Amino acid sequence: MARYLGPKLKLSRREGTDLFLKSGVRAIDTKCKIEQPPGQHGARKPRLSDYGVQLREKQKVRRMYGVLERQFRNYYKEAARLKGNTGANLLQLLEGRLDNVVYRMGFGATRSESRQLVSHKAIMVNGRVVNIASYQVSPNDVVSIREKAKKQSRVKASLELAEQREKPTWLEVDAAKMEGVFKRMPERTDLSADINEHLIVELYSK
């Protein structure tokens, strides 16, 4: 499945919630009628079956993290293989992606922009350039901006935006040095309560 390149607001309206795909700190429901699906006049939402609800939740989370269908299924398989709660494991694997960590640290305004920084070799992990967005960051890893990329206006603008967001407790960021430490894996309570990962587990368990 190809990566979606269309309007970001349309995806959030499709899922009925802000997927944080835009760079602004203002919630997008102040800009558009997020409760209405995309399309002329916003088509009325059909009543979903249990399967439909599970599928929508999976699509919502997959789009939020910018992961393709095959990748997402592989993350689920890995989460099911690990000890502990499968749903929580899945979210930790997604949160541990390098592009997501770059976003959480405030170096990129969105996960999409953070993915670009990674692919353009602007990001280092423990002093070495890593250009794979899906690279799994481990506790105590140091993630930083390459020296020649520190002058990029988009990085500086992203750090300014990040000052207005709630700072993740599992990260430690030095904005002046443009580097941060992935202190630990986030607990479930650290992450959005708007995600119902048990629905995804139910979907894939069938």
Curated annotation (Swiss-Prot):
Listed SUPFAM superfamilies: Alpha-L RNA-binding motif
One Pfam entry name: S4
S4 RNA-binding domain location: 96-156
Record-linked Gene3D superfamilies: Ribosomal Protein S4 Delta 41, Chain A, domain 1, RNA-binding S4 domain
SMART domains: Ribosomal_S4, S4
RNA-binding found in the keyword field: yes
GO MF annotation terms: rRNA binding; structural constituent of ribosome
Similarity comment text for this entry: Belongs to the universal ribosomal protein uS4 family.
Cited function: One of the primary rRNA binding proteins, it binds directly to 16S rRNA where it nucleates assembly of the body of the 30S subunit.
Name under which the protein is recorded: Small ribosomal subunit protein uS4
Protein species of origin: Serratia proteamaculans (strain 568)
